[in-house]
Every structure is written in structure tokens, then in C-alpha cells.
């Protein structure tokens, strides 16, 4: 096949996906169960290092109403380079280094789909629980804050690491979705609020794309025969 023919075929396929046929009525996506998956990047920083962006995957459950939806899901970030943060004992003022390499976030919130079109924007807000997986106090002596002089110091450093490893956060999301029958393809950006005494400093950000598929109605049809 000639290059121009390939280009023309690709353009026709793209148009078919992005724009519904003339006169086609957009499918009603109200009151449906959607299961979906995402992949993208997780941007974070600590009080010991600037922003890093590492890979993230997630799954979610979307239950639609007319123009709103309940959004429930979870995401896991895998840090390619071990992250380092410093925790401070509020009672003694002593500081200890902590390392970790994974972050998990569970969330719930409300989404709005105002246009109900083939291509539509969406936005939402909610709350979540962000957890640094298996934070470990560093007692290697490599830095002045990685010293545990006694077993009691080591135990205290580990307790501080665990205490600073999980916090509640708020979040906001925005994106664009392309609907093709029961399938939806989307791209989105999410920002998570900062939390006090947390191993992650400031807001965190996720940039992701994904798909979700409707597996049926979330509302029983009362007119159907039983």
C-alpha cells in the first residue's frame, strides 16, 4: 500500500472514532456501571528532594447518573528511584531519614459530565487516603540524620516513619473523554492536596490516560416484566 493510501486510511479511521456519523444520536450513558483502568505518571516531592515523576497504574469504578457520577478507585505508583524524606520527632526535635519506593492512593468522589456528547469534558472532586508503602527508617549512618545510636532510637525512628506514612487528602480532577458505544477513552489530570507531617511534601499530581467499559445498567428497569 502506498504511503498516501495508508495516510488516507488512517485519517478515515480517526474520523470514524472521533466524530459520530451525521445524524447519529449520542448513546444514553445514564445510570450505568463502568469499570476502568488507567496508566500514567505520578509527580511528587519530599522535604529531601524535588519533584520526581514515576509510573502509576490504577483501576476504578464509575456509576453514572444523568450528568454526574460516583467515582471510586485506587492507584499504585512505583518509584524507579528510592525516595528519601526526613521525619522529625515533635517531642525531642530529633530528625530521622526514611526511604520508600511505592505510594498507594484510594479515593472516592463525584464527577460531572455536563455535555453528554461523543467528545466531552469532565471534572470532579473528592477525598482519598494516600499511603506510602513500607516506609523504612534509615539507620545506616550514611548521613547525620541516618543514625540510630540505640535500639530504642531505631524503634522510635521506625514508629515516626509509620506515623508519617498515611494521610487523608482532598483531590480535584479534570479531563476529556471520547465515547464509542459502551467504551470510553479518556485523558485526565488530578491534583491531591498537601498534608501535614506526611512523607510527601506539598501537593501531588497525576497525569494519566485510560479506558472504561459499561457492563450494564445501574438502575433496575421497573417497566420490565418479571
Can you describe what each PLM-predicted range is?
Residues 27-35, 66-70, 117-123, 181-183, ...:
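Outer-envelope beta-barrel architecture signal
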Residues 43-47, 91-98, 155-162, 194-199:
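Extracellular loop and loop/strand-boundary signature of outer-membrane beta-barrel proteins
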Residues 178, 203-226:
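Outer-membrane beta-barrel "beta-signal"
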Residues 31-33, 51-57, 100-106, 119, ...:
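Residues that define the transmembrane beta-barrel architecture of outer-membrane proteins
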Residues 19, 23-66, 212, 216-218, ...:
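Short glycine/proline- and aromatic-enriched beta-strand/turn motifs that initiate or cap beta-hairpins
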Residues 55-142, 214-215:
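Gram-negative (and chloroplast) outer-membrane scaffold detector with strong preference
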